[in-house]
Amino acid sequence: MAPSAQPTAAMATFTRMVKGQMRCYSAPVDAAIPASKRKYIPTSGTYPKGFFVSGTHVGVKASNTKFPDLALITSETPCSAAAVFTTNKFQAAPVQVSKKILNATQGQGIRSVIINSGCANAVTGKGGLEDAMSMATKVDEYTGVAENGTLVMSTGVIGQRLPISKILSKIPEATSSLSSTHDAWLTTARAICTTDTFPKLLSQTFTLPSSPGRTYNIAGMTKGAGMIHPNMATLLGVIATDAPIVPSALQSLLKTSVARSFNAISVDGDTSTNDTVAILANGAAGGAPINSTQNDDYVVMQNILTSFLQSLSQLVVRDGEGATKFVTVRIQNSPDYPSAQLIASTIARSPLVKTALYGRDANWGRILCAIGYTQGVAPGTVVPERTSVSFKPADGSPVLKLLVNGEPEQVDEERASAILQDEDLEIIVDLGGGEKGELGGEEGVYWFCDFSHEYVTINGDYRT
């Protein structure tokens, strides 16, 4: 049950709406969504019952004169809620407020998520905390919740206060324009963007073993293009499902899924102050609640959520600031999963690896270098004499072997260059000696992008 297929063109109305900025806020230009990215924008979707969304223009950042920058996701009935947050010590005000609300409610009775883009509300002191809380309180007021029914997220420039009066004045409009249509979901996904070039939205249907004749729905939106590296980075995500899941099971499901999705991507190796991924489950589709990690429904739901979040998080990498490559690095035959992920992570954030890929240079020595200096792996994990490195082309043709059991291969540089012309590439690192697999079957996977000249331009201009 894969996420809904991504069509080859954006809806005409949506393309007209976003025309005007290629990299929102950082370097405004009069350009539509890049042609190469339009295929990732869905023209339809299957959305969870009982959820309504809206995207409203506030003008949080002065340079944004027309695009939606306030997103609201709400359920007509109380939800179970769970979230994972940034590990950055300077946690933004909305992160602190959302944590407090989840602790107070134990993940029960949450109805909404309110998100602004254009200002991170991070490192803003007591006033920033009050601003974040006032956003939650205002949404509660307009959705008929007594208190602690709304989670808050913000993204944008650090160290600046929100134009809170402007935001609060637009919440009535945000609530009155709530809708369950595909257009509304897409507009809402657009409202959380900053330097993104396209809105990131997925949806799918699924079934559970206990109710094989019942259809459930899940939808998710995310934002992020820079400052992306676990745990997590300047990355926001909201997932909604109409499956019935109790809060404790939902938190466990989310934590495990994020570890193999949003915490397995990297754009630039920086970890933000704001990242949050939250999930709401309202149970509107009916059926028996998932209330234990031991039942069949939980196991199936875990697989569904992990696969769904992997697809959603990969859209972030595909929109990496200035990126021209989408790279999968797969570490095979590791003695344990954590060691495999550490090696994959080190390769994914290596500037030398990333710039070589941008330059279409099959410089496998940089990959080996990153493998060799990886910290924290289990003793005996990396042994040069049994390490192999290959490129796996996106077109399904045979892998290009670069290093086999510590011995360099005669590399066809022309073929290597041709492989690196493609947008997609997989790097395979075998720690067990190629086909021998001496260490066993643990595998780690990371997704990352290259570094280009545009990345420097975008981030040099970010506050202008």
From Swiss-Prot:
Pathways per UniProt? Amino-acid biosynthesis; L-arginine biosynthesis; L-ornithine and N-acetyl-L-glutamate from L-glutamate and N(2)-acetyl-L-ornithine (cyclic): step 1/1; Amino-acid biosynthesis; L-arginine biosynthesis; N(2)-acetyl-L-ornithine from L-glutamate: step 1/4
The coiled-coil regions, if any, are none
**Modified after translation how?**
The alpha and beta chains are autoproteolytically processed from a single precursor protein within the mitochondrion.
**Catalytic activity line of the entry:** N(2)-acetyl-L-ornithine + L-glutamate = N-acetyl-L-glutamate + L-ornithine; L-glutamate + acetyl-CoA = N-acetyl-L-glutamate + CoA + H(+)
Q: How does it assemble?
A: Heterodimer of an alpha and a beta chain.
Record-given protein name: Arginine biosynthesis bifunctional protein ArgJ, mitochondrial
| Record CDD domains | OAT (cd02152)
**Top-tier EC class:** transferase
Entry's localization field: Mitochondrion matrix
Residues at which substrate binds:
194, 223, 234, 321, 459, 464
Q: What does this protein do?
A: Catalyzes two activities which are involved in the cyclic version of arginine biosynthesis: the synthesis of acetylglutamate from glutamate and acetyl-CoA, and of ornithine by transacetylation between acetylornithine and glutamate.
Alphabetic keyword roster = Acyltransferase, Amino-acid biosynthesis, Arginine biosynthesis, Autocatalytic cleavage, Mitochondrion, Multifunctional enzyme, Transferase
Active site: residue positions: 234
